[in-house]
């Protein structure tokens, strides 16, 4: 099998892992609190990745450690939003709303760095706003709490992307080592928060053990390894389009595994949001969306 085809199939599989993560996160809530679950997940991923990339870690610079710590702290905000968002909204909504960082990122760059976005951003934002309203407002005129939390998660993702983009552009920063440090810092912060605000405990039932291990091994650890080793074998635009499939996969998982059924209006909204993501990715975020799931 050609390297490009194999790489793209593995990246599609990785996207599937991320899509299923929303469902398994909700399953884990029956026995684990949110902070404890994230600590378990990220520390497991760190201890999986550290031996794989030990050569990178041995030779990493001070700048690499510094930026790994900064991005790891920001990633905590991302996953606080993602985890609690899943808890208080539908899996389908969480999947679509949490992926909006690809559109939010250029807005952050415009505000913070005065970097002019592409002209099609306005069209993408309009489509996305209409789609978000159709998806989330239902029969009322306000967001559910979980929808708002997921939107805050997307904003945090946007900040994570911008910071990561600036960090890896520095010649003294090793992106792989930085990402492993990032995951370790995220796990350590979540563990500290869990001891402060929760009563950390390990899963009790085999079902929850399986779900938690899947999140750590496949959705965080293995997914990162696949992304960093395989995306170089295909075009960045194709990688971005593959990752745009995540909200669609999330909706399919929610339909078949969780039995979620959306109003036809919500499906129209989801389609508009998906189209806005594709519009942005056709020749836009070569780095944007590649970075949005870095280490997740």
Predicted regions and their residues:
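Glycine-/small-residue-enriched transmembrane alpha-helix faces in small-molecule transporters
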Residues: 1-36, 73, 140-166, 188, ...
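C-terminal-most transmembrane helix of multi-pass membrane proteins
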Residues: 4, 9, 41-43, 50, ...
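Specific transmembrane alpha-helical segments of multi-pass solute transporters/efflux pumps
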Residues: 17-22, 50-98, 106, 134, ...
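Membrane-interface helix-cap regions at the ends of transmembrane helices
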Residues: 20, 24-27, 31, 44-61, ...
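Helix-helix packing/entry segments at the starts of transmembrane helices
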Residues: 38-40, 94-100, 164-187, 220-256
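Transmembrane alpha-helical segments that form core, pore/gating elements
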Residues: 46-49, 105-106, 142-200, 212, ...
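C-terminal transmembrane-helix exit sites in multi-pass transporters
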Residues: 48-58, 82, 101-123, 248-268
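Hydrophobic transmembrane alpha-helices of multi-pass small-molecule transport proteins
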Residues: 49, 69-70, 75, 117-137, ...
């Amino acid at each position: 099998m050609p390297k490009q085809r194999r790489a793209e199939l593995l990246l599609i599989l990785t996207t599937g892992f991320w899509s299923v993560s929303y469902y398994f996160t909700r399953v884990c809530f029956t026995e684990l609190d949110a902070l404890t679950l994230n600590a378990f997940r990220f520390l497991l991923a760190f201890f999986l990745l550290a031996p794989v990339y030990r050569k990178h870690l041995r030779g990493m610079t001070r700048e690499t450690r510094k930026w790994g710590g900064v991005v790891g702290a920001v990633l905590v905000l991302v996953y606080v939003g993602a985890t609690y968002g899943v808890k208080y909204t539908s899996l389908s909504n969480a999947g679509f709303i949490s992926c909006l960082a690809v559109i939010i990122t250029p807005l952050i760059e415009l505000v913070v760095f005065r970097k002019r976005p592409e002209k099609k951003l306005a069209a993408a934002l309009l489509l996305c706003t209409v789609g978000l309203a159709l998806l989330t407002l239902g029969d009322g005129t306000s967001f559910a709490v979980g929808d708002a939390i997921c939107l805050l998660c997307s904003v945090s993702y946007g900040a994570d992307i911008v910071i990561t983009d600036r960090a890896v552009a520095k010649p003294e920063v090793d992106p792989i080592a930085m990402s492993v440090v990032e995951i370790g810092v995220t796990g350590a912060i979540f563990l500290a928060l869990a001891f402060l605000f929760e009563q950390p405990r390990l899963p009790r039932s085999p079902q929850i053990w399986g779900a938690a291990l899947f999140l750590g091994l496949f959705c965080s650890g293995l997914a990162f390894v696949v992304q960093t080793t395989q995306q170089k074998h295909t075009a960045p635009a194709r990688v971005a389009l593959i990752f745009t499939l995540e909200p669609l996969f999330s909706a399919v998982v929610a339909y078949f595994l969780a039995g979620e059924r959306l109003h036809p209006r919500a499906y129209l909204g989801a389609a508009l949001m998906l189209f806005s993501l594709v519009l942005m990715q056709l020749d836009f975020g070569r780095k944007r969306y590649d970075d949005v799931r870095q280490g997740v």
